[in-house]
């Protein structure tokens, strides 16, 4: 199926701050009605907001400053995951029936640079899309395959290599020391040579992995569904240390200085601080309920959202609870930092911001529709809604 490139959107309505007075106390800078649901979080880079809608089926590109449209690209299919931006390109994965596309679009103009097409049964082509400094693009497909692409340059063979597992779902990869590292539901963690995709090392454990690995120096740290935290050499896969918790680990470790902070799941309901070098426990703080999202660090305060409807600030050095604030709902996203505040999605219709040092509520954005996870960038926090509104919140 061919696609169309639109430069203008005739039905676009720009809503001013005055039209948003129903959200009293929320510093809305601008909002744009695009008349189509926005389900994936937007991406923001170089003063531009990129997002897709259920009807546009491709990138919509707006000025981050004032919400005016810059260009629009129609893929002709269903967008499968949030857009990825880098190296002056926008990457979008989409499908039409049994045909799967991965396209690179010029970020400034909306011009198609290249596309990769694949034909097979209609299932999710892409669940993770990432890039790194060596200009390789990795797309995880079908839940068990990993592809590498050259995203830049005029070359005839865009795809570099492909890794296919045994059908088990893979985590998002990290790239360090020329090694592509990821966990798998087949109970293994893999390290691949980044230029060839061949297995550099593989470690088998007793449980599957769900979360992306974290990196500390030349060490990769990852927890599994059995509650065990593993640390491996990035180049050899040698086991450096193991630490056992009492609950499944479904989130990525937070690395801060020489410490790794681990959120343990149901059955444990706590946060561990471990030495990244030795795996020694530094402290453990039990909470009223587990956290489904990784914590974030704000000036030596660890901010954690708990499934019991609270957000907490812990001392990074001791684990002591410094503050606790009610969400009046269930957290639906990892907290993100913006101008000293911890911002997160609560339930399906609310974005809340708390002072990361004191826990005080700063503002709450309410929507009649389901909102995306918040995306902070520079002077604004960007949110899309299922009602077709893109909102920029800022001071």
List each language-model region with its residue ranges.
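Aromatic (tryptophan-biased) beta-strands that constitute blades/sheets of beta-rich domains
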Residues: 25-39, 50, 57-58, 68-75, ...
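Short loop/turn segments that connect beta-strands within beta-propeller blades
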Residues: 63-66, 106-109, 150-155, 193-197, ...
């Amino acid at each position: 199926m061919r696609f169309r490139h639109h430069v203008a959107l005739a039905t676009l309505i720009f809503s001013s701050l005055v039209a948003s007075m129903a959200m009293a106390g929320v510093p809305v800078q601008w909002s744009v009605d695009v008349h189509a649901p926005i389900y994936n979080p937007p991406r923001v880079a170089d003063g531009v907001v990129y997002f897709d809608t259920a009807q546009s089926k491709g990138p919509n590109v707006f000025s981050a400053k004032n919400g005016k449209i810059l260009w629009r690209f129609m893929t002709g299919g269903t967008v499968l995951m949030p857009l990825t931006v880098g190296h002056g390109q926008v990457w979008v994965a989409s499908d039409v029936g049994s045909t799967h596309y991965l396209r690179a679009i010029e970020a400034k103009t909306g011009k198609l640079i290249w596309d990769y097409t694949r034909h097979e049964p209609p299932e999710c082509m892409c669940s993770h899309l990432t890039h790194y400094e060596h200009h390789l693009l990795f797309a995880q497909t079908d839940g068990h395959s990993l592809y590498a692409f050259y995203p830049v340059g005029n070359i005839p063979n865009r795809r570099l290599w492909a890794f296919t597992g045994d059908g088990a779902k893979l985590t998002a990869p990290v790239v360090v020391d020329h090694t592509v590292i990821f966990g798998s539901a087949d109970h293994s963690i893999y390290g691949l040579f980044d230029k060839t995709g061949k297995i550099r090392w593989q470690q088998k454990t007793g449980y599957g992995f769900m979360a992306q690995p974290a990196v500390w120096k030349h060490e990769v740290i990852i927890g599994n569904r059995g509650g065990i935290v593993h640390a491996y050499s990035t180049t050899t896969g040698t086991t450096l240390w193991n630490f056992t918790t009492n609950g499944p680990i479904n989130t990525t470790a937070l690395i801060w200085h020489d410490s790794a902070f681990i959120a343990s799941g149901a059955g444990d309901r706590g946060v561990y601080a471990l030495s990244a070098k030795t795996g020694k426990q530094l402290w453990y703080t039990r909470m009223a309920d587990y956290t489904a999202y990784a914590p974030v660090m704000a000036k030596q305060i660890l901010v954690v959202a708990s499934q019991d409807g609270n957000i907490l600030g812990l001392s990074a050095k001791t684990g002591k609870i410094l503050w606790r604030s009610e969400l009046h709902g269930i957290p639906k996203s990892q907290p993100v930092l913006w101008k000293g505040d911890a911002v997160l999605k609560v339930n399906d219709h609310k974005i809340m911001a708390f002072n990361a040092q004191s826990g005080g509520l700063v503002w709450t954005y309410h929507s009649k529709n389901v909102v995306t996870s918040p995306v902070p960038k520079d002077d604004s926090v960007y949110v899309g809604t299922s009602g077709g509104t893109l909102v920029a919140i800022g001071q």
